[in-house]
Structures are given as C-alpha cells and as structure tokens.
Amino acid sequence: MVSLTTCCLKNIVNQHAHVENTVLLYHLGLRWNCKTLYQCTQCNGVNYTNSHSDQCKNKDLFLMKVIVKKNLAVARTLLSWGASPEYARLFCRNTEEEQALNVQQVADVSSSKILERLTMSYKENDEQLLITFYLLNLSTNFSTNLREQVRFNIVSYIICDLAIHQTFKIFYAKNYSLSTLYCIFLAIYYKRYTALRKMVKIYPGLKPFAYLTGFMFDDERVMETYNSTDDEISECKNRIIAIKGCYGNFHCRSDIDHMYAFSQNNFW
C-alpha cells in the first residue's frame, strides 16, 4: 500500500513542478541539483523527467549519495518512496543524521553484506558506476570493512590474471585507495568509458593504471580514451610485457579459494 506521505508528495510535484515553486519543492525534498525529482512508476527508480528511461536512478544508490552530501530533505523523500533504510544507516551510523532520519532502530545488517550489494550495482550504466565511485571515496564510515569487502570482490569474481594482482599492488603502494582502484578496474572491465574518463580526470595519476589494466584485457579503447604521448603508451606496454613475463598468463579465476589464499599470501 502506498503511504499517505508518498501520495501527497506525488500530488505536489505533479502540480507544482515549475520555477516559481522551487522553494517549496526544495523544502519537501523534491529538488536535487536544480532539478525536480519524480518516482518512476515503471521501474520504481528516480528520474528528472517523470517518464521511464535508461536514465532512471537506483533509489538506494541515490539515497546514499544524498546522505553523503547531507541533504536530509531528499533523503526523507527517498525513504518514503521505498529506498532501503539499511543503506541510509550504513552511511550515517552514530551521527546526527541517523537520528534526524529516524533510522537508528533499523535492524543492523552487516556492512559487508550491504557493501556487496553496493559493489555489484555498477553493471547497469556509467552513472551507476560513477555514483558507486563517489560514494566509496567520499564516505568516512567504511574504514576496515570497505577494504576487506573490496579486496574480496576483486579477488573472488573479477580478477582474470595474476598480472592484475601485481598492478593493484603497484598502485596500492602509491597510497591510492582500494575502492578507487576497484572502480577504475570495473570501468575498464565493463567498458564504461564515459565513467572511466571522469574518474581519471579526478585522479590523473591513475592514467598508467588504466593503461596497464586495459592492455591486460587487450582493450585498445582505453588508449583512445586519453590524449597520451607515444612514450606513455610504450612505457605501459613494456610494463605489461615485464609483468606477464614474470607471472605468465596463468589463469586462476576458476578457484576462488585459491585466488583468495594467493592474494593474502603474496600481495596484501
């Protein structure tokens, strides 16, 4: 059954979604980044056009983003539209926002389970991947749990080649967070080039990492994504050859336990 709050919000946004009413819409949590929010009746997501399209946003990911940005009005609206309070609590546990959103009584789902759902949400489109990237890098509430979960995800069902382990090791040693490396890797793995360009613009020092990973998958689009000198490309190719020369092309994806043990013993 649809709640009274949801019905009221829907009626308000349908009748007042024009310029002179933006103050009211902001106050009710129906505006975000100067755009009016609508709940999609087809996919139950969130959009700016009041019609279903591939631009509809996942409510849970969107909820986490607005909480990180401390926009509690929009967070309340998304919760009333059915976004998961577990996600909200993950990002505001033991803070004033937790009480303001009244999610302190929500059952304490383990962070690792929620993070697993979060890190499996990147497949839908570039924007979903970028939201995940921003959340993992902006939030201060993950600490050790994030590192462990990202490590598990990388090792268990993403990595195809031992050379990838070495690449993560090299750049992790340069103090780039695992979550950042993970999202860059996913952008290449799932060919999300728009997201990849935006991420590397934020962290230009990760260009070589993107090259290395792209060459490992024989993905020449990664090269075309940036304006790079021949020297940079040549250097990356040489590093790939050197890494594969040391570790070979031994694939270990078929045995998750072995992959995890190998990673624990050698690279972390």
UniProtKB/Swiss-Prot annotation:
GO terms for cellular component: host cell membrane; membrane. Keywords: Early protein, Host membrane, Membrane, Transmembrane, Transmembrane helix. The lineage of its organism: Viruses, Varidnaviria, Bamfordvirae, Nucleocytoviricota, Pokkesviricetes. It is a single-pass membrane protein. Plays a role in virus cell tropism, and may be required for efficient virus replication in macrophages. Residues 194-268 are extracellular. The chain crosses the membrane at residues 176-193. Belongs to the asfivirus MGF 300 family. Residues 1-175 are cytoplasmic. It is found in: Host membrane. Induction: Expressed in the early phase of the viral replicative cycle. This is Protein MGF 300-1L.
